[in-house]
């Protein structure tokens, strides 16, 4: 079991480092003439992406096409640096009992979603319960399998979809507790996964519409999604965390062929691409 735990932690850190490395690359760069007021809006970077295969909902994503924009649109309890080291983002503190079966989580005050509504403890507990609930058929459901009551939310035919995980208890607007069904010492790392992002009340009123126009609390906010072409994010001026954008926005350009993206990198019409296609390395 300890070996499994270590393996999970390594995977968690690898995932975090990869997501963060990309996020840092984006938030750290911008065009050199971006300081000029005459060029307002030119300090926007373009990044390679594939078309998301699912709605832009944190708990319903399992591929990079959706994962990249979601990482920038949503702040979680913790964030990671390029080495995979965690630091608090929305969390004020995350404390576990001695056997790591209960966590007490306090969140910072003053955080808001881009629709102006506050980020509260319930923004997390309702989001996590929604994702865990089989009735809602979310791809990230299994991330919540160690939370008490998860098994009771797995028979979708008997559920309405709004049932809450019994292991989550809201203490007040800025504190909640998490009771687990078994010891999980890496839970405090897992809460940095995109699936653990908070959701505003508007999500629960119309999840389908939200998936096309997500409302987050991250360093960027959603502007538009032209399917199979591009996703446009702009800097969120109200973001209060440790991943502040150093540019005015990110435009994810959708490609079906890496070679086309690489050609755009070479011509200067694309700023960021994580890997070079094999054809470009042939001599």
Feature names for model-found ranges:
Residues 205-208, 237-282:
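Ligand-site clamp/hinge motif
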Residues 26-38:
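Bacterial lipoprotein signal-peptidase II cleavage site
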Residues 3-26:
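Sec-dependent bacterial lipoprotein signal peptides
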Residues 41-54, 92, 102-105, 124-127, ...:
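Short, well-ordered beta-strand elements
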Residues 48-98, 215:
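N-terminal lobe/hinge region of extracytoplasmic solute-binding protein
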Residues 106, 123-125, 132, 136-200:
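Surface-exposed binding/hinge segments that line
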């Amino acid at each position: 079991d300890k070996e499994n735990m270590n393996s999970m932690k390594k995977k968690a850190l690898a995932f975090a480092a990869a997501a963060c490395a990309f996020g840092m690359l984006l938030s750290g760069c911008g065009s050199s003439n971006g300081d000029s007021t005459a060029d307002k809006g030119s300090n926007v970077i373009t990044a390679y992406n594939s078309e998301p295969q699912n709605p832009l909902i944190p708990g319903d994503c399992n591929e990079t096409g959706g994962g990249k924009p979601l990482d920038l649109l949503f702040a979680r309890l913790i964030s990671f640096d390029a080495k995979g080291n965690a630091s608090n983002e929305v969390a004020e503190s995350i404390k576990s009992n001695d056997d790591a079966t209960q966590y007490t989580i306090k969140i910072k005050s003053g955080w808001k979603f881009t629709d102006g509504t506050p980020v509260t403890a319930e923004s997390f507990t309702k989001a996590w319960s929604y994702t865990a609930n089989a009735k809602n058929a979310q791809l990230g459901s299994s991330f919540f399998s160690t939370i008490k009551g998860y098994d009771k939310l797995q028979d979708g035919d008997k559920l309405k979809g709004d049932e809450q995980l019994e292991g989550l208890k809201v203490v007040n607007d800025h504190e909640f507790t998490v009771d687990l069904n078994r010891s999980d010492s890496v839970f405090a790392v897992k809460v940095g996964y995109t699936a653990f992002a908070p959701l505003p009340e508007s999500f629960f009123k119309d999840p389908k519409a939200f998936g096309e126009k997500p409302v987050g609390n991250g360093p960027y906010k959603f502007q538009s999604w032209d399917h199979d072409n591009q996703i446009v994010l702009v800097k969120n001026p109200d973001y209060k965390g440790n991943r502040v954008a150093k540019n005015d926005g990110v435009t994810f350009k959708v490609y079906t062929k890496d070679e086309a993206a690489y050609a755009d990198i070479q011509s200067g019409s694309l700023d960021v691409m994580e890997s070079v296609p094999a054809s470009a390395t042939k001599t």
